[in-house]
């Protein structure tokens, strides 16, 4: 008994908690990298382990009274959004932020890079050689000609390109100080190759937009870097305007909608049938008339979580990043 008491008194529980958090983080990255959804049984199985690691981190971390107050606010907001919208994204985000104390962000990014690169390579190579389902299908191009696309063992071709996009983005972030023309050439070639296989027009456009922001940040003087901070609210306003004022009879709007694979029509249809709300709404409201998946994060939050929650994030980001 004395040995047990001595063990608990002398053990570095803070380090144990940090290690547990890295385990929690790695499991979540792994499940997303393998394209598992929260409804999949294997995801639920590993989620139990992840939550156990998260609990260890919380009970072994010392928080100040102010931090505890913020934890209560974030958990209440996350749980409320989870219960009402039936989406756990915000709850997991807040839980991760809460448990990050004393953890090295650089190491977390490094883990995410290694896991993402390994899983993407495994899925692409495995599906190419027949180990996994390559997910062959056809889709109309800009001239409405059917072309072959592949999902590489993931749900959809767009999901496959998203996995590539996130992996490239992590690589760029992790090696940000080393970025040069060779990095641009290499990552662009990779993105264009998978664009050919997935025909994800929105994804490739966003990829080169990210590079445009990187180049701007590298060469712009400090007084012009306000543009980077404003990119988030500008993107939100643009998404909102296209959703509110979409008109299929307008040739410009019709072309823009076609270039983003019908996403504007999907958002506009939900807006016209369900309207907007200041507070979160139950997800079942959107099942009566299903128009498609809302994968524009700005409008997903706006329609599902309400205007108050949607405004909170771009305003907070802009306030924190303005020079």
What annotation goes with each model-predicted range?
Residues 1-76, 176-177:
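Transmembrane signal-anchor hairpin modules in multi-pass inner-membrane enzymes, especially those
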Residues 77-120, 215, 316:
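Transmembrane alpha-helical segments and their membrane-water interfaces
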Residues 218-254:
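A membrane-periplasm/extracellular boundary helix in multi-pass inner-membrane enzymes
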Residues 264-292, 305-311:
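TM-adjacent membrane-interface loops and short helices in multi-pass inner/ER membrane proteins
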């Amino acid at each position: 008994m004395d040995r047990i008491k001595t063990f608990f008194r002398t053990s570095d529980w803070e380090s144990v908690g940090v290690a547990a958090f890295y385990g929690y983080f790695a499991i979540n990255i792994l499940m997303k990298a393998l394209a598992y959804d929260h409804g999949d049984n294997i995801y639920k199985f590993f989620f139990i382990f992840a939550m156990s690691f998260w609990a260890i981190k919380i009970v072994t971390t010392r928080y100040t009274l102010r931090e505890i107050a913020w934890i209560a606010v974030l958990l209440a907001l996350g749980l409320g959004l989870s219960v009402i919208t039936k989406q756990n994204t915000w709850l997991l985000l807040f839980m991760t932020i809460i448990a990050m104390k004393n953890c090295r962000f650089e190491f977390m990014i490094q883990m995410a890079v290694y896991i993402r690169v390994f899983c993407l390579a495994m899925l692409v190579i495995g599906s190419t050689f027949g180990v996994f389902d390559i997910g062959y299908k056809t889709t109309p191009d800009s001239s409405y000609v059917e072309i072959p696309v592949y999902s590489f063992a993931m749900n959809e071709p767009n999901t496959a390109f998203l996995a590539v996009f996130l992996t490239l983005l992590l690589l760029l972030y992790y090696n940000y100080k080393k970025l040069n023309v060779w990095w641009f050439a290499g990552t662009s070639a990779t993105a264009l190759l998978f664009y050919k296989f997935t025909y994800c027009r929105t994804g490739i456009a966003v990829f080169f937009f990210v590079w445009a922001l990187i180049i701007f940040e590298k060469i712009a003087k400090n007084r012009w870097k306000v543009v980077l901070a404003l990119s988030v609210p500008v993107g939100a306003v643009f998404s909102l305007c296209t959703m509110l004022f979409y008109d299929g009879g307008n040739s410009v709007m019709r072309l823009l909608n076609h270039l983003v694979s019908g996403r504007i029509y999907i958002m506009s249809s939900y807006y016209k049938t369900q309207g907007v709300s200041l507070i979160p709404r139950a997800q079942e409201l959107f099942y009566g008339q299903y128009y498609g998946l809302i994968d524009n994060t700005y409008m997903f939050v706006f329609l599902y979580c309400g205007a108050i929650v949607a405004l909170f994030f771009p305003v907070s980001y802009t306030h924190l990043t303005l020079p």
